[in-house]
């Protein structure tokens, strides 16, 4: 969208906009559940997928804050890339009769009812399989565009797909997703450190605790926090090890770099990993740490 000269784009973090005083606590609680109680998260995720009643955020306070945003921005179109955002805007449209088109950009390769809303005007589906699922849920074929998962322009540039020149040193890029979480990172880095001719780059995202723990630990391991220039590091990698987030998978697909997904444990990430393995652009290590250590040695 930013490449369109006539378009003015305003990006909003809806959680922060709607709940400015508690958004950090909500995010922290979610992160704690994912890191320590992911079994509960997966149970809730699966159960919500079986519910016939559509769950939407409602309430006078929510509508009041959304009205303030709409009145201030006067958008010609609303694009949502997160299920909570989809449900909130759909609920507001239903309540107020807002006519502004709602575009739902699905950023998981697996389908869940959290993405569907009758007030959505256009769906951007990552795959044909997702389009068929949306049609089963009642969406019209003409309202669904199969676009893949959109990635930033830096991943579409021609030089992003240039192969790295081979030398004696192999470079491994490790990423833990938006939360900066990676299973068994200690064992993984120790193994890579012990392998001759291997350098590693770890991107911890906004996980400051992980950054402080690993920065300057090994001279052959570069540790970075949040960076906007992910494509540069993917372009320079011989192998990427990461979580199976939908956007990340499509970024790696555009970068044409070999991919390892280690022990996906969140339900939607497991579904994403299965898709990547079936399509042949990722090696998924489902089991014990010994399994991926053996794969690294090959």
Task: For each feature predicted by the language model, list its residue ranges.
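Acidic donor-binding loop of glycosyltransferase active sites
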Residues: 235-245
């Amino acid at each position: 969208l930013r490449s369109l000269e006539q378009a003015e784009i305003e990006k909003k973090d809806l959680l922060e906009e709607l709940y400015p005083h508690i958004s950090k606590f909500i995010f922290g609680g979610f992160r704690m559940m994912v890191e320590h109680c992911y079994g509960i998260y997966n149970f809730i995720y699966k159960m919500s997928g079986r519910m016939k009643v559509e769950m939407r955020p409602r309430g006078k306070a929510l509508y009041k804050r959304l009205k303030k945003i709409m009145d201030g921005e006067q958008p010609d179109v609303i694009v949502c890339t997160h299920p909570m955002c989809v449900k909130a805007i759909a609920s507001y449209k239903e309540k107020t009769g807002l006519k502004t088109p709602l575009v739902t950009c699905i950023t998981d390769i697996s389908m869940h009812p959290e993405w569907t809303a009758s007030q959505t005007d256009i769906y951007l589906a990552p795959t044909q399989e997702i389009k068929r699922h949306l049609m089963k849920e009642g969406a019209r074929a003409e309202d669904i565009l199969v676009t893949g998962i959109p990635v930033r322009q830096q991943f579409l540039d021609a030089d992003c797909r240039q192969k790295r020149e081979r030398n004696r040193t192999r470079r491994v890029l490790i990423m833990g997703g938006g939360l900066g979480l990676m299973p068994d990172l200690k064992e993984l880095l120790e193994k890579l450190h012990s392998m001759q001719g291997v350098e590693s780059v770890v991107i911890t995202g906004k996980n400051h605790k992980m950054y402080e723990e690993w920065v300057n630990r090994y001279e052959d391991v570069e540790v970075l926090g949040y960076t906007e220039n992910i494509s540069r590091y993917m372009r320079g990698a011989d192998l990427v090890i990461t979580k199976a987030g939908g956007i990340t998978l499509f970024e790696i697909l555009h970068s044409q770099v070999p991919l390892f997904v280690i022990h996906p444990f969140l339900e939607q990430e497991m579904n994403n990993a299965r898709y990547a393995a079936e399509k042949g652009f990722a090696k998924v290590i489902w089991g014990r740490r010994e399994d991926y250590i053996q794969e690294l040695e090959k």
